């Protein structure tokens, strides 16, 4: 028999009754029932109940073991009685009667429990992550993550993609976030950067004559953490294709990701045909370029109903500024003053002056609008708004006014708030969509200049003619995102493979041809030697896993994450370097000034 085990703790079944077996694992818990000890023995695969009665030669050792000790147990497999069968365990029809117990490793008193879902401080959980990972939910999440990545690899291979790996030490490149820099010992004063994404390398692969590349790529960005973004590193399913238009990328990736969701959704419905929503339409309907389509609320413009109306706040805004619009947020079943007042109070808590509203109720046989706005604009305008929005008895509507560019984010948050408060969001489904036609440029208010809105390597719609126009902010890019339940899970574009277009695109944001050659020299040179039309995208693996397992944040699906301050409490990183190491790298720390 093997030194440690003949079976795993998930393997034994009724067919094994009468067998002598050996198991090894962690003591999950010990229970004393009338002098008989019951030990739940756990390993990576599952759990088996071990029994030690006072007549057993293993009983003395069984009395000493404690939770999370690692032990080896030899014994006989016996069937449980009908009344003691545990239908919730694969091994629940049998138990192991111990004949010998060997303690392989004792455990100190635990700083946190490893069963159940303890509400322990995150820093304690991360410092003792090796214990935290023993919890069933977290353990299952990590296993499921591995299964999802394996399924991605398999499905990408099935549709003709080949996995290639690209360098981890590379040059610094402005991708929209800070780089992690790595000093060069051989070239003092110079630095490598960890890649924010394999963007340039995968495009160079297409220029080199490869096609249908993919990679499970580690990416590194020195960003502030949040619930849907880990500090430091993350992983993406990266891909690129040659001789394609954006529809070709969509047609290849939509069935693949739908199949991944269907495989791991646990029976929840998944969108069959992903709608393609232009960016501008998404902003106006949902107040976001990553809308949660499980929420049925769609905003509409109702400016005309307030122009020249008795509600002077809106009417005067419209009259004095042609950019002003009034957006309506319909809220079916929200037609109570209490709910409307809660929404108004919430808006004020967000720094807004309030949230105007109308709600409708029947007065006898007549449907009437109620609330201050209804009284000010009159019955005819109130009814016109209700008709436009398709509302009825017991429904409400909220209004946001101003220049859309300044208020659309708040309007989107109000839409989300109303949908959640009214339980309109179906949380038992996955709603996916494409967001397309992103703006190529945007206005940088801080620096008072035009800047790239998203990926600077995207192909602008309209080509050189558009880039030479006076209205740069109207240019759209062949850029697209995939969104699921309010989270961006992928982003991509058709690339700009023309050196002339590349230079012009960067000139419009204040960078010269020399700047382009210095910052993107490899890509710029490559495009001068026969570059095919190409495009691709990248899926955020961490976010996809988080959605599929129902985790609240990314730390619940990552093995050894950092905390919110970008610290690895388990390994003690970041940490000071030894003086000798710094001298070797020609680096001298500069003392930080105290505030």
Curated annotation (Swiss-Prot):
HAMAP family, sorted: Asp_tRNA_synth_type1 (MF_00044)
Looking at the keywords, is Glycoprotein present? no
Residues flagged as site, Important for tRNA non-discrimination? 33
Q: Where in the cell is it found?
A: Cytoplasm
**What is the purpose of this protein?**
Aspartyl-tRNA synthetase with relaxed tRNA specificity since it is able to aspartylate not only its cognate tRNA(Asp) but also tRNA(Asn). Reaction proceeds in two steps: L-aspartate is first activated by ATP to form Asp-AMP and then transferred to the acceptor end of tRNA(Asp/Asn).
List its EC numbers.
Answer: 6.1.1.23
Annotated region (Aspartate), positions in chain = 199-202
Kind of enzyme, top EC level? ligase
Subunit-structure text: Homodimer.
Write out the similarity annotation: Belongs to the class-II aminoacyl-tRNA synthetase family. Type 1 subfamily.
**One GO molecular-function entry:** aspartate-tRNA ligase activity
This one is known as Aspartate--tRNA(Asp/Asn) ligase
The reactions it catalyses are: tRNA(Asx) + L-aspartate + ATP = L-aspartyl-tRNA(Asx) + AMP + diphosphate
Q: Which NCBIfam families match?
A: aspS_bact, PRK00476.1
What are the alphabetically sorted keywords of the record?
Aminoacyl-tRNA synthetase, ATP-binding, Cytoplasm, Ligase, Nucleotide-binding, Protein biosynthesis
Q: Name one Pfam family in it.
A: tRNA_anti-codon
């Amino acid at each position: 028999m093997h030194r440690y085990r003949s079976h795993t703790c998930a393997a034994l079944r009724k067919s094994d009754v009468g067998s002598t077996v050996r198991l090894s694992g962690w003591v999950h818990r010990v229970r004393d029932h009338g002098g008989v000890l019951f030990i739940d023995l756990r390993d990576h695969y599952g759990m088996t109940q071990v029994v030690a009665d006072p007549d057993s030669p293993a009983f003395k050792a069984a009395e000493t073991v404690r939770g999370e000790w690692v032990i080896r147990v030899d014994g006989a497999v016996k069937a449980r009685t009908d009344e003691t069968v545990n239908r919730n365990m694969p091994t629940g029809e049998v138990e192991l009667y111990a004949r010998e117990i060997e303690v392989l490793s004792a455990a100190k008193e635990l700083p946190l429990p490893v069963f159940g879902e303890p509400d322990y401080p995150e820093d304690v959980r991360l410092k003792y992550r090796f214990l935290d990972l023993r919890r069933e939910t977290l353990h299952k999440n990590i296993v499921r993550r591995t299964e999802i990545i394996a399924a991605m690899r398999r499905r990408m291979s099935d549709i003709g993609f080949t996995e290639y790996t690209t360098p981890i030490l590379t040059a610094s490149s402005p991708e929209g976030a800070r780089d992690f820099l790595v000093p060069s010992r051989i070239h003092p004063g110079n630095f490598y950067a960890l890649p924010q994404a394999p963007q340039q390398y995968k495009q160079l692969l297409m220029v080199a004559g490869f096609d249908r590349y993919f990679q499970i790529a580690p990416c590194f960005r020195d960003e502030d953490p949040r619930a849907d973004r880990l500090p430091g590193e993350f992983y993406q399913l990266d891909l690129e294709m040659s001789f394609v238009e954006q529809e070709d990328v969509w047609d290849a990736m939509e069935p693949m990701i739908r199949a991944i969701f269907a495989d791991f959704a646990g029976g929840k419905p998944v969108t069959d045909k992903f709608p393609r929503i232009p960016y501008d339409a998404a902003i106006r309907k949902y107040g976001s370029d990553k809308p949660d389509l499980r929420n049925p609320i769609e905003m509409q413009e109702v400016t005309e109903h307030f122009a020249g109306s008795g509600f002077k706040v809106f009417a005067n805004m419209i009259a004095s500024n042609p950019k002003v619009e009034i957006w309506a947020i319909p809220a079916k079943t929200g037609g109570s003053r209490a709910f409307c007042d809660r929404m108004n109070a919430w808006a004020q808590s967000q720094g807004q002056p309030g949230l105007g509203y109308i709600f409708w109720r029947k007065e006898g046989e007549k449907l009437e609008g109620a609330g201050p706005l209804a009284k000010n604009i009159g019955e005819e305008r109130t009814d016109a708004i209700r008709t436009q929005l398709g509302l009825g008895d017991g429904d409400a509507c909220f209004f946001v006014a101003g220049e859309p560019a300044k208020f659309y984010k708040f309007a989107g948050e109000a839409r989300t708030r109303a949908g959640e408060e009214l339980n309109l969001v179906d949380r038992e489904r996955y709603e996916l969509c494409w967001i397309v036609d992103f703006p190529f440029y945007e206005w940088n208010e801080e620096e008072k200049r035009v800047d790239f809105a998203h990926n600077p390597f995207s192909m602008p719609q309209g080509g050189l003619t558009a880039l030479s126009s006076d209205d740069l902010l109207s240019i759209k890019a062949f850029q697209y995102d995939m969104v699921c339940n309010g989270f961006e899970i992928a982003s991509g574009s058709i690339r700009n493979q023309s050196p002339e277009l590349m230079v012009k695109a960067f000139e419009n944001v204040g960078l010269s041809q020399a700047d382009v050659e210095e910052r993107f020299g490899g890509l710029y040179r490559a495009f001068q030697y026969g570059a095919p039309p190409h495009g691709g995208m990248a899926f955020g693996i961490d976010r996809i896993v988080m959605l599929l397992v129902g985790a609240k944040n990314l730390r619940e699906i990552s093995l050894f994450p950092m905390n919110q301050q970008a610290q690895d409490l388990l390994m003690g990183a970041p940490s000071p370097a030894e003086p000798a190491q710094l001298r070797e790298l020609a680096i001298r720390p500069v003392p930080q000034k105290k505030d």
